[in-house]
Amino acid sequence: MPERFMRGIEVVNGIVWGPMGLGLLFGTGLLLTVRTGGFQLRRWGYWMRHTLGAILTDQSVTAHTAREEQAISQFQSLCTALASTIGTGNLVGVSTAILSGGAGAVFWMWVMALLGMMTSYAENVLGIYYRRKDPAGGWRGGPMYYLRDGLGGKPGRVLAVLFAAFCALASFGIGNLSQLNSIAGNLNAAFGVPEAVTGAVLAAVSAVILLGGLKRVAAVAERLVPAMALLYIVGALTVVGVHITAVPAALAAILKGAFGLRAAGGGIVGYGLSRAITWGFKRGAFSNEAGLGSSVMVHAASNVKEPVQQGMWGIFEVFADTMVVCTLTALVVLTSGFVDLDTGRIAAGAAGSALVGLAFDAVFGTLGSKLIAVCILLFAYSTTLGWSCYGCKAVEYLFGAGAGAGYRVLFVALMPVGAVMRLDLAWTLSDTFNGLMMLPNLIGVIALSGMVVRITQNYLARKLHGSPAPPLLSAGETI
């Protein structure tokens, strides 16, 4: 690859994932938090009752739509979105953030997640409000539509096309080649399964699932995501439970490191305030995908009517991904004894990328690393399913509904390739395209933040105060 091209990619990544891009992401979440009166904090109990509580008590949330309907249930839309957000980054990525930015990075990951909840909320409110019916009776929605129809004019149309193009390209990198490579490498290391066999088997399974369209992907996701999350959460809680006496010290290290109160350990890893903030923000952004706008495309396919209701699912998505799964990974690493909380050094013989597996091995024996390999298989494969939907929606926006079938065939055909090839460039380009997706999306979210506030105030006035005001449900469709 020409050196000039690689330098250009590094420059772009430095912008979109450097102080400028992360500052924009932080600022967007802060703006929305302020303008909605801290909805994710002040209405904590309300959105938890209407998401997690609704899963347990409201059958309409989990009930499948009729076979002939193109829409999916609220629970299916959540699971399909979580399929892509809960990935290998929740394991390896959190370890990397701690080793590169110190325990304090976890605190700033939490901060980014709290603000990201409102970014995800706004994306999904806009996604429902600006979605459109397709000829088959299903919903078409996503950042492309609120950029085109919400912003309007040539700028809106250009930003919509840019978003869709970058999303389609990103789906082949972070959503396919990179994930298959992680799965194949881990299964080979843990069980001796040849990479080529892994690629062929997963391609065959994916062909059956993906060629069935969004409804089939959603049906798989609603079973896979709860199972894989429960498997990892139970395992991680067991590890943390064994080391329960180390939890107070771990939490203290997180708080001290967050504000640069813990000195650097003298090694290659720094624990200064700036590194803690940078790595915490990066991990929070990469993990929950709030700001990318990707998950809006499956949330918009939900059979929900109220934009705010789907917005609350966006809040819960970030909460589950970062505040639950990533936090558990952080505690697994920090209580394991493999990381010195005072110096930040890794214990002799411990590899940074394998810290979670080592922590599980210390509790479960050799079964621990195999359990992590299975978790990586499930996490990475679910990411593939989620991103296949995003890429397909983007391609259909650019080239029409007929292009979706060709996209799925190409997506499946590339899976065996990803399992066996070296993918350093693919990971780099994935970061690039993800960041380039984020920029037009955040421009739209900021520009339309006033509409988000109006829809939110309208909903709360009707639901909490009995206002007779007409509901704000859609910009152009009869609901």
Segments predicted by a language model, with ranges:
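N-terminal alpha-helical transmembrane segments of multi-pass membrane transport
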Residues: 1-84, 88, 98-105, 116, ...
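Transmembrane helix-loop junctions in multi-pass membrane proteins
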Residues: 5, 35-40, 89-94, 172-183, ...
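Membrane-interface loop-to-helix entry segments
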Residues: 24-32, 36-49, 163, 180-187, ...
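Helix-loop-helix module between adjacent transmembrane segments
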Residues: 32-33, 112-137, 148-181, 185-209, ...
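Flexible loop linkers connecting adjacent transmembrane helices
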Residues: 38-72, 96-98, 102-105, 110, ...
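Alpha-helical membrane segments and immediately flanking helix-loop junctions
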Residues: 59-98, 126-144, 148-150, 165-168, ...
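Membrane-interface alpha-helices at helix entry/exit sites of multi-pass transporters
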Residues: 68-71, 102-111, 146-149, 154-162, ...
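Extracellular/periplasmic helix-exit of transmembrane alpha-helices
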Residues: 123-133, 237-253, 261, 265-268, ...
